């Protein structure tokens, strides 16, 4: 498949994922999955008269695809995530529409692009009108028990421009916290009960999830558990319990690692802290040590995922619980000579996505899907699972048809937005399952606007910008797609937090002098 080739490009090692990776307790599920009880071939949403499924949504922070065995890295240990991949479906072409935590988490919750919900650092909190139609609220209204643990990543406000509050009262069980939260469980006020046994936050969230599952199973009501791990976000703070996992290990660098593989990138992309962090975060001279702590943090998440899945089995709800695992954005980890995230390149914007629906006949086959999906698609996916009609005005589309038909398609393109950081690095890109077009508008102080075009099917490492090559028809096609998203921005952006003027800034046909006036407002 195209996606498998895409992942093999990142590292030289690529493990074979078995068709099924069941524990001993999973054989009953295998039997159940063979029973022809699904009238729907493409989706497994809740239909009238059916028992509503439970939903477990697991979100990490800053996790790149090559931190997992099931995405092609045989040098890391992610047994529970690899088992989830074998039990469910892996999505190889899943992107975040904004590659920074606050906006991406709002994208996920609301099913809307950033310019539609208006929530990000330097802009503002999520407006209550958008939160009111988020998946946690809509599922609770549908009768679901809901729980939230970890880093929710944003606050909710009723007045644009004003500080918001955490939506504590909107969940039946709360284990989340403000801001970035802490790796020290004792510092997370809503999680202090777990601090003695689980002093590091990652395992504490696994324990929280297990406890909620036990409580919800007694209620005989469907539940939705959302767990948002801080890991593997900086500062690197691995759980000491796992210190031996990667002690003394070395790691294969991605084939696009280092500054020499980023010389063709737009000059604008080097003006943010992502460029500085290649050296500042020691990717250049201490790669093995840096990646050992990074992978160690992911390992603790993997343990927590195992705790949650074990609880589903223990309390007899596994066969009716859909598990979704993904990340809010990726991480560059030295690729092209950059660190951190935000930029529209693959390591930053393409993230893991695994979905396991044990009720579906396609489960247990280790299937992969290389159709384009986005983080905004997760909200309508969750709603369809629960049998809830999506509200109007969202940008996402349910992924469930792809679970039934991995060769299908739910969208042709997706915008990749950045309006955070220095204005020089503001960018808007559009991606398809095979191509990516990036536009860098900044033209001040000797700069010129830059176009980048990549064939991500043939060149997944983004080593050749073909915007000035022979692909004229492809370039024009991607320009038209890009212009269409600019038009959407102009028509649908929220009227606050300074989002509407960015439609002018990203318009390829507007003179720089007119864009400067927009930035100065």
Label the model's feature ranges.
Residues 70-75, 89-112, 125-126, 148-161, ...:
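Short, solvent-exposed turn/loop segments enriched in Gly/Ser/Thr/Pro and often Arg
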Residues 160, 172-173, 178, 329-335, ...:
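C-terminal cap/loop subdomain of S1 sulfatases and analogous C-terminal strand-loop tails that border
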Residues 107-206, 235-236, 418:
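Catalytic-site neighborhoods of secreted/periplasmic enzymes
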Residues 78-79, 108, 142, 151, ...:
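Polar, surface-exposed loop/tail segments
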Residues 28-39:
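Bacterial N-terminal signal peptides
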Residues 51-55, 87-92, 142-147, 169-172, ...:
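Loop/turn elements at helix/coil->beta-strand transitions in domains of secreted/extracellular proteins
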Residues 48-89, 95-98, 140, 461-473:
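Active-site-proximal N-terminal segment of extracellular/periplasmic enzymes that hydrolyze or transfer
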Residues 49-50, 62-75, 178-203, 212-373, ...:
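Active-site-proximal cap/lid insertion segments
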